[in-house]
C-alpha cells in the first residue's frame, strides 16, 4: 500500500462492512453525523488523536508497521447465552452467543494466525465456550476471578483471587495442570510502583505463571457500545464512522507504542496487542488483522513475543499508559 495516507486508510475503513453480526431488535432512526462524532470524541484519546493528526499524514505513508512483530491476545470471551437480565444500558447485551465465538475463531483462521490466548475471568466462566476455544487450537490464560482493582485490593486479596480463578480453570486441563500458565493483571495502569506487586509476583512465579502485559490496547470496548447502538437502529453511516475512527486510533496507538518501547529497550521490540471479546471485535477482527498485515505487521505466537528481553523488565507494562499520555500531550501542543 505504497503512498497511502491516513485519509485513504479512513476511506478504506468506511467501505468495509462487518462480516455479519448477531441479530438484534432494530430500532429505526439515524443519528446525525455530528451526534455520532460527538459520542466518538468522548472515547479517551479519540479527540486527542484526531486533533494531533489533523495535519499529519507522513507517518502513515507506505507500510508504517513494516518490521513490527505482534502477538494478538484477547481479554475475556463471549458467553454461550444472552442474559435476559442484562443491564438495559448495555447496548451489546446480545453479544454472548456461540456464533460470536465462531466469528472470532474464523477471523483467526482466515488470517492464518498463530494460536491466540484469551484471558479468562472465572466470574464470567463459560465451560462450553472455553473448551470450544481450546478445541479450535487456541489458548487460555488467567485474568483473575473478579478482575480486582489494584488500588482497592491487598496482595493477599489478589492472591486469593488468582487461586480462585485457578480452581475454575482447572476443569479445562483434564486433571493435569499445564506446565506453563499465563496471567495478565486486569486494567491498563502499570503495577510497577504498587507496594503489593512483589508479593503477588512471587506467588505467580511459585505457581508457574508467566506474566503477560500488553503494549498495545486499542480501547475496542469503548467503541463497541457505540457500534451496537448504531446497529440497533440500522445506522450504517454511524457504524462506518465508528470503524474509520477506530482505525485512526489504532494507527496512532500502535505507532506510539512502537516508538516508546523502542526508546526504552534500544531495539524494535516484539509487541503484544490486546483486544476485548465484544461485538465490535467479533464483527471486525478479521478485517482488522488483514489491515495490520497490509501495513507491514507480522503476527507471531505469544511465546515468541515473550522471549524479547523487554518483557523481563517492568517497563513493558507501562507502554500502554505512556502511549495514551503521549496522545493527549500531542493534542495539547496543537
Regions inferred by a protein language model and the residue ranges of each:
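Bacterial N-terminal signal peptides
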Residues: 7-17
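Positively charged n-region of N-terminal signal peptides that target proteins for export
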Residues: 1-5
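Structural recognition of alpha->loop->beta junctions
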Residues: 137, 206-207, 325-329
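Bacterial signal peptide processing site
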Residues: 22-23
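Active-site beta->alpha N-cap acidic-glycine motif
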Residues: 35-185, 288-291, 298, 305-307, ...
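Catalytic domains of cell-wall/extracellular-matrix polysaccharide-remodeling enzymes
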Residues: 124-132, 149-298, 304
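Low-complexity, Gly/Ser/Thr/Pro-rich intrinsically disordered linker/tail segments
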Residues: 285-334
